[in-house]
């Protein structure tokens, strides 16, 4: 709808200039807001003010921005084909990175269905608790103990 705003937060790159030019040429400058080099404190505030989170990344080391958004209570639209599906779990919507119409449809789906958006965000929040430091540490400890026990048993044979 015409009251929807898009906030793009990231590094200032040559591509940023292309986005700014496209936005201006399509008379969207009043609804598309580009924020460069946002610090973590400001980023948390942006997440808190958002309705949902779109992450159209083709390549990603792990998908930390998705987890951050989910931890702030946001539902997520992200791309298929990288680690993002593992980072976000089944409650996020995933679209092929070249599917512009699919990305728009997924975003509209979340914007137009507040109950679904909230349910997806809650389920995603439950999913990402597995990545919290204390849970990861406990999982690593369990794996070490299992490995030690396996070694111990194999040495007895």
Question: Where are the regions that the model predicts?
Answer:
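Aromatic "clamp/platform" in nucleotide-sugar-dependent glycosyltransferases that forms part
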Residues: 58
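Glycosyltransferase donor-sugar binding loop
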Residues: 5-20
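Short hydrophobic beta-strand element within catalytic cores of glycosyltransferases
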Residues: 66, 71-78
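C-terminal alpha-helical cap of glycosyltransferases
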Residues: 133-157
């Amino acid at each position: 709808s015409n009251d929807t705003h898009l906030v793009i937060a990231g590094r200032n790159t040559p591509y940023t200039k292309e986005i700014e030019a496209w936005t201006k040429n399509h008379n969207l400058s009043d609804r598309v807001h580009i924020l460069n080099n946002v610090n973590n404190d400001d980023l948390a505030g942006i997440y808190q003010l958002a309705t949902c989170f779109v992450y159209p990344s083709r390549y990603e080391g792990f998908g930390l921005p998705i987890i951050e958004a989910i931890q702030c209570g946001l539902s997520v639209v992200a791309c298929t084909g990288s680690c993002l599906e593992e980072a976000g779990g089944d409650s996020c919507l995933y679209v092929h990175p070249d599917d512009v119409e699919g990305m728009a449809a997924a975003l509209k789906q979340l914007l137009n269905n507040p109950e679904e958006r909230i349910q997806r965000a809650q389920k995603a929040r439950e999913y990402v608790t597995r990545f919290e430091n204390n849970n990861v540490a406990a999982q690593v400890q369990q794996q070490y103990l299992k490995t030690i026990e396996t070694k111990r048993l194999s040495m007895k044979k």
